[in-house]
């Protein structure tokens, strides 16, 4: 088994444990949605998840996808990303990281910048806000779109 597959399986097991701890029933559809999110590096929309899973789950609906994503979000194993357009994207990586977004094709890529980890503490100190989280986005044109 490759390291990536082992990592996906480990993340899936941890997510299932979180769902069980919250009293959520584990269904094959939930597992498939989670597995897709964990293995996806594209921050998919609910429609993209639906299109990827519907061949294996012909009775699954977009509403089922949305309902499960809401459950995952409420438990804290998925983040919903909204960007002014009408479709939310979903990110399994809930650790502090940032996004660079292609202005032409909408591709979203994660990147780390550890120096920003202190920004919440600094903002809280300077403003007396109770900071809950932060989000940073950088926009540009990806290599694939530049080459077109």
Curated annotation (Swiss-Prot):
GO terms for biological process: negative regulation of DNA-templated transcription; regulation of secondary metabolite biosynthetic process. Signal peptide: none annotated. Induction: Autoregulated. Induced by low levels of hypochlorous acid via superoxide dismutase inactivation. The keyword Cytoplasm applies. The keyword Repressor applies. SUPFAM superfamilies: Winged helix' DNA-binding domain. One of its GO terms (molecular function) is zinc ion binding. It is found in: Cytoplasm. InterPro entries: FUR (IPR002481), Fur_C (IPR043135), WH-like_DNA-bd_sf (IPR036388), WH_DNA-bd_sf (IPR036390). Its main location: cytoplasm. Keywords: Cytoplasm, DNA-binding, Manganese, Metal-binding, Repressor, Transcription, Transcription regulation, Zinc. Zn(2+) binds at residues 102, 105, 142, 145. One of its GO terms (cellular component) is cytoplasm. Residues 1-84 are annotated as: DNA-binding. Belongs to the Fur family. Manganese-dependent repressor that controls a regulon of oxidative stress resistance and iron-storage proteins. Regulates expression of genes encoding antioxidant proteins, such as katA, ahpCF, bcp and trxB. Also regulates expression of the iron-storage protein ftn, the ferritin-like protein mrgA, the ferric uptake regulator fur, the manganese transporter operon mntABC, and its own expression. May act as a hydrogen peroxide and organic hydroperoxide sensor. Required for full virulence in a murine skin abscess model of infection. This is Peroxide-responsive repressor PerR.
């Amino acid at each position: 088994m490759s390291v990536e597959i082992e990592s996906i399986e480990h993340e899936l097991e941890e997510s299932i444990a979180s769902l069980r701890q919250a009293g959520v029933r584990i269904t094959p559809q939930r597992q498939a949605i989670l597995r897709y999110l964990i293995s996806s590096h594209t921050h998919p929309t609910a429609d993209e998840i639906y299109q990827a899973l519907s061949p294996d789950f012909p009775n699954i609906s977009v509403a089922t996808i949305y309902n499960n994503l809401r459950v995952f979000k409420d438990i804290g194993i998925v983040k919903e990303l909204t960007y002014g357009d009408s479709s939310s994207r979903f990110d399994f990586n809930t650790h502090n990281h940032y996004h660079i977004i292609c202005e032409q094709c909408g591709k979203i890529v994660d990147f780390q910048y550890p120096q920003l980890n202190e920004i919440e503490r600094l903002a809280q100190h300077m403003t007396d806000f109770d900071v809950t989280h932060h989000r940073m986005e950088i926009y540009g044109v990806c290599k694939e779109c530049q080459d077109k």
